[in-house]
Amino acid sequence: MKLPVSSPFEDYVKPLPAGDRAALADFFSGFDSHCILAKAEKRKLREDFEKVILYYVNLNLSLGRALELLDPANLGGFYARPAVLWFPLDDAAKIYPLSMKPGSMSVFRLSVYLKEPVVPELLQMALDFTIRRFPSFATTLKKGFFWHYLDTAKRRFTVSRESDIPCRPLKVSQSGSPAFRVLYWDRRISVEFFHVLTDGTGGMVFLKALTEEYLRLKGIDACVDKGPWALGETPSPEEFENAFARIEQSSSSSGFVERAALQMSGRLSENRPCRVLHFRMDAAGLHEAAKKYRATVTVYLLALMFMAGKAATDQMKGEQSIQVPVNMRKFYPSKTVRNFSLYCGIRLPIEKIGDMEAMTGEISRQLESKGSKEAMNRMLTGTERLVNSLRFVPLAVKQPAARLIYGFLGDKIFTNTLSNMGVVQLPDRMAKEIEAMDFVLGTAISNRASCSLVTVNNTAMFSIAKLTADPSFEEKLYELLKRDGVEVKVEGSELYES
C-alpha cells in the first residue's frame, strides 16, 4: 500500500510555529471566499499561491510580507462569481473567425524584455491577478446562429514556457479555450492575441498591466494602482465597447476591391512564419535618418520597404502596395481595449521605386489622404453596410464566402504590411526594469513579409515575420538602413524549416 506523498508546501507548513500556521489558514480561508471554480481549476489556482509563497520563503522574505503581496483580495470577484457576461464581436473582429482556415489565423504578438530572467511562478500569479481587469479577454470564442461571439470563461488562464513558432494559431475551437496565450523565455514575456479580441493598442494595455503586476510581485513599485488601468479598479463598459458603433455613417462609402499588388518572389514556406527577425535600432538615430528626407519614421520605413520589396521580386511591371493600420482612437478618443483600427493601402508603381526624395513625398501625400478621418469614415461606412447586408445570413452560409473574399481582398491587394505602434510610454520606475519591446504580426496567406515597429526607452524594434526563406527583402532593408547611418543589431530566429 502506497502512502500519500506530501507536497513541498505541506512539508514547509508542518514545522511552522502555530502563529504562522494560523496566518496561512486565515489566508487560504480568504482564498476560498474569492474562488468558486471547479475543483480541478481551484486546486491549480491554490497551487499558484503555494508556489509563490515557497519562492518568497526561499528568498528569505517574511511570511507576513509574502501574504501581504499575495492578498487574495487581488483576485477581486472574478473567480467568485459565475460566468454571465458575453460580448458581441466588434465591427473589425467579425471577419477574423469567418476567415479562419487550418493553420491560418490572424494572430499578433507583443513582448517585453526585462533586465532579469522571468520567474514563471510570479508571472503565473500576475496573470491570475490581472485577468479580472480585462473581462473581454477572459472569454472563449463561440458560434451563434448568425455571428460568432465571446463568452466569459471562468477558469485559471495558464502561462507557458515558449517552445513553438511565434504567432501559431490558437486552438479556439476547443471548449473554454482562450483567444490569447501568455509565454515566457529567459527575460522575455510575450502575449499572443487572436485579433478577434483586440488590436495592438488594446494588447499593449494588457501587456503593460501584466508586466506591472509581475514587477509588483517581484517587490518593485512600478506605479501599479495609480493609472486608469489599475487592477483594483472596476471594469467600466466603455473599456470594452464596440467603439465603431459610436461613429456616424459617412454620406459615402469606399469599396474594398483594389488591383492585385505585386508579391515578392520567394517560394512560400509551409511554416507560418518560417522566420522572425528583429532589427534593434537607436530610436534617435532612426529619427535622424528619416529627417534627412523630411519624413516621419513611418514614411521613411515605408520607402525603404518599397525599395526592399523591389529587390525581392522578379516582376518588372505593376504596383507594390503596403497595408498600414490606422488607429481610430486618434480621431475618436476611446478607452476601449477591443479592436478600433482600420487600414489604408499605400501604392507605388514599381518603376517609380528608387528615388527616396520622390518616394517619401508621395508616400506622405497618400498617408495624409488615405489615412485621414474622412477616408476612414468612408471605409467604416462600407464595412458597416457589408456587415448589415449579412446580418441575417446564417453563419454556416457566411463562413465559406467570407473565406474566399478575405483570401482575395485581404491578401492579394497588398505586398506586405507595416504596423507602427509608436513610442510606448511607461512610468519611470517601470521603464528602469525594461530593456526593450517587440511587436510581431502573424503572416498572411501569400505576403512574404509582415513588418511592425515599437519603440520604448529609445530602442526601436523593427520586426519582420517571414513567409519565405528568400533573404532578399531583409538584406536590402539592412543595407539601406546602414547606408543612411542607422546602426542595426539583427536578432531573431533561425529558419523554422525542417
Regions found by a protein language model. Give the residues of each.
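Acyl-thioester-dependent acyl-group transfer interface
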Residues: 1-148, 154-180, 310-498
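A secondary-structure boundary/capping signal
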Residues: 114, 192-193
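Hydrophobic (often cysteine-bearing) scaffold residues that line and stabilize catalytic clefts
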Residues: 119, 199-203, 297-298
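General beta-strand recognition
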Residues: 188-190, 461
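Short amphipathic alpha-helical segments
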Residues: 297-306
